[in-house]
Amino acid sequence: MLVSSINSAVWGVPLLVAFTGTGLLLSVRSGFFQITHVGTWMKTTLGSIFSKKSRESGKGSISQTQALSAALAACMGTGNIVGVAAAIASGGAGAVFWMVISAIIGMMSACCENILGIKYRYRDENGEWMGGAFVYMERGLGFRQMAKIFCVLLVIASLGIGNMTQANAAALSLSGSFGLSPAITGLILAAGVFAITCGGLKRIASAAEKIIPAMTAIFILASFAVIIKNFRAVPSAFSRIISEAFSLRAAAGGAAGYGIKKALRYGVARGVFSNEAGLGSNAIIHAAAQTDSPAEQGCWGILEVFLDTVVMCTVTAITLLVSGAPTDGDGSLACAAAFGSVFGKAGSIFVCVSICIFAFATLIGWSYYGRRGLEYLLGAKSAKIYNIIYAAAVFVGCVADLELVWELSDLANALMAVPNLISLCLLSGEATKELKKTYHN
């Protein structure tokens, strides 16, 4: 298929190098802030959660914890469960190592996106905060046409990777586990998404704040139950991750260097797909956070990548590896087998429910990205039309064959990243200067 071939070429080594290279540039210019100032960004984020003053001070529409939850809702989709299994199947256990390394590097991309998002944000015609990659492209660089192209791709991606593919994963999971008709799943999901998205960002953030922390905690606790039961296999799992990350040959043979190349490629790709650092999407929600400090919001971007990939994806990977579940096939089946090794039939049900809840969270999170992109292009009046189209796309995603949609949405994501990575590089000095000014780096 032509689109598939183009997609494979676009999402090849050059783009993954661009993601990593941009993260490295920002890391170097910030003095590797994400590593040298762990205590600082942890205190700024997790340490402030119990501080009412910190959470509610400054300009903005939603609290910083709500912004984090909403951004995590958008990126913590089904990929954090089945996508990790797919990465291991394609790149071996070593992919997990490179996934974490790419996330650590990508933390500074997320940080600087948020810094620039807050610095250049403004109120739109409805008085809502407008910010994100397309705003700093226009206001920071004067690249309005680039910003428009970014928004077109953002809208396409929101209907694809942020909508139909997530809905499809939920429908397939419910159909396989309970025999529920995809059409019924589609109607329920579409109604739920429409009810929340019509309430705007505050309703989206409120829902995300209730869903994400609770579901993430439950998933991690269930994962630890599997890990504890198989604790003797933990050293072996870590040994595999390290050894296969630097293996010169793939597990099934191949040319020298092929193993490490696959582990690198699929590990970095999984990290990018999971935390979205470098895509420029998450900064759209963070731009509405209540804060007067761009650098402070940048720290929340670091935490977001840490929780999404370093914690969530790594825990999923260790769970799969210690359980002995087959990781060379369908990702959802591998996860079901892993949790089933401890919880039996309930394990499969748990995976199904987790996929559905995380998919729903992604649906409501990405709806805001697409809506803001369309509003930037056509004005605030387009929001109502977008909400209707978005809900309809949820239903279509549940009942349709989405092979082409997957390919097109992946392509849109890749093309979104290009202008954003260019912008981050051009504004790298400005972003890191803001960070150093605030934290006396």
Language-model features: where?
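Extracellular/periplasmic helix-exit of transmembrane alpha-helices
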Residues: 112-125, 224-240, 248, 252-255, ...
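Membrane-interface loop-to-helix entry segments
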Residues: 18-25, 29-42, 168-174, 180-242, ...
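Membrane-interface alpha-helices at helix entry/exit sites of multi-pass transporters
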Residues: 53-61, 92-101, 135-139, 143-150, ...
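Flexible loop linkers connecting adjacent transmembrane helices
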Residues: 32-62, 86-96, 110-141, 326-342, ...
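Helix-loop-helix module between adjacent transmembrane segments
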Residues: 26-27, 102-127, 133-168, 172-197, ...
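Transmembrane helix-loop junctions in multi-pass membrane proteins
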Residues: 29-34, 79-84, 159-171, 193-207, ...
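Alpha-helical membrane segments and immediately flanking helix-loop junctions
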Residues: 53-89, 116-134, 138, 155, ...
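N-terminal alpha-helical transmembrane segments of multi-pass membrane transport
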Residues: 1-74, 78, 89-95, 106, ...
